[in-house]
Structure formats: C-alpha cells, structure tokens
Regions:
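Noncatalytic linker/hinge segments flanking ATPase motor cores
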Residues: 55-63, 191-201, 221
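Acidic, S/T/G-rich, low-cysteine, solvent-exposed domains in lumenal/extracellular/periplasmic regions
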Residues: 1-188
Length: 221
C-alpha cells in the first residue's frame, strides 16, 4: 500500500485527510485510516442549539478546540473556529502498538448526527444521540529512533473554503496555518495579523497567505 509505505519509511511524514459529506463510500481508504485508529462515520453533524448555529444553518456551527498540540502559533484563540457540514470522526483506539491517537477538535454537547446519504426532512427528524463528536483526530506512529509519522484527519473539507479562510469572523485560516507551522517545524512561522490591530499591510489576503503555507508544507517531507 502506497500510503503505508509513505508513512512508514521513518522520515517524519505527515498525511492530512479531509472528509466530505458528499463523498462516495471509500472502503480502502477508510480501512487504511482505521489501521491508524481513525474511523469516519457515515453521517453529518448537526447543531440543535439555535444559539450556536451560524447563518441559520444547523450544519454550520462553532467548534471547540479539545487539544492545543497544533495551535501554538495561533494569533487569537478567542475568534471562533468552525467545521461546517462535517462528518463525525471516532478513535478506534487510543494506543495500539506504536500508534497513538488524540482528539484535536470537537463539536458541542448539543450537536447530534443525521445520516448524510438520506433524504430525511429536518422538520421530521428527531435527535437520537448527542455530542460532543470528534471533528479532528491526530494519529502518530512512533519509530525506535524517536521520529514519528502522523495522520491528521478532519471531518470537514468545507472548513478549507475560500470564504472561511478569508473571513475575519472565524479563525480557520489562523488555525490551519498553526497546524502547518507546527507539523513542518517552522522556526520563522507564517502568521496572520489580527484585523483589529494597526500595521503595514503585505498586500496579500488571508486565503493567499494560507496558500503560501500550504505550498510550503507539501514541499517538505
């Protein structure tokens, strides 16, 4: 398996996975993720508390940071983070031989799940299970020399949309830049200056700065 080979060559590799509620069943990929302790559930996360819903859309709500391991270079953690139209994730195990998992992001306690492949009418839908549900999971494989390879799985591909990355109302761009800075061990980190502070502008919008960080990460093993 090419993904196994990529992550098992003892060179500190990282794989990022973003789930989507419109994607087809991917049995081989999902089986691979489960070997790393990550399960992708066939449902969508939906918020039941109107106070936490964004733009009157129950699939669009705020997200809680559960683990700060990848958020060290965020400039402002008070700005809300969102994982819209997300599939819930689950940890298959916490530790299995040389692989360990940890939850990075969670939905609120008032979220529920609805099968994403159904034509269910929300007006007739009744929640059967409540959160929090995992929305991001980090899985690490440790080698004898102390190096690690890792998978970071996210339940929402929409969280990377241009509108969210360029929005000053959400910290998605700040969060993902911190993730990439941390995973690539950057000493001179890329950061997004808060819009509430003065200072000289660089002539790049948030999405463009994010793409610089993304390109750098892809180029580094």
């Amino acid at each position: 398996d090419k993904l196994d080979a990529f992550l098992s060559d003892n060179e500190e590799k990282t794989l990022l996975y973003f789930a989507d509620t419109t994607q087809p069943v991917l049995p081989r990929l999902e089986a691979f993720l489960e070997k790393w302790g990550i399960a992708v559930e066939p449902s969508s996360v939906i918020e039941t508390d109107n106070r936490k819903i964004i733009n009157s859309n129950p699939y669009f709500s705020t997200t809680q940071i559960e683990n700060t391991e990848l958020t060290d270079t965020m400039t402002d953690i008070s700005i809300p983070l969102t994982m819209p139209f997300a599939r819930p994730l689950d940890t298959v195990f916490e530790t299995n031989m040389d692989i360990s998992t940890s939850v990075l992001l969670q939905s609120s306690e008032t979220t529920s799940v609805i099968p994403y492949e159904s034509e269910s009418d929300l007006e007739n839908w009744t929640p059967e299970e409540y959160g929090p549900f995992s929305l991001a999971i980090l899985s690490k494989k440790s080698f004898e020399d102390g190096k690690t390879s890792q998978i970071v799985a996210y339940g929402s591909s929409v969280s990377l949309s241009d509108s969210l990355l360029s929005s000053g109302s959400f910290s998605n761009a700040d969060y993902y830049l911190s993730v990439f800075n941390t995973l690539t061990h950057r000493e001179n980190v890329i950061a997004i200056q808060s819009k509430t502070l003065g200072g000289q502008e660089l002539g790049l919008n948030t999405a463009q700065v994010f793409l610089i960080g993304l390109s750098f990460m892809i180029a580094v093993p």
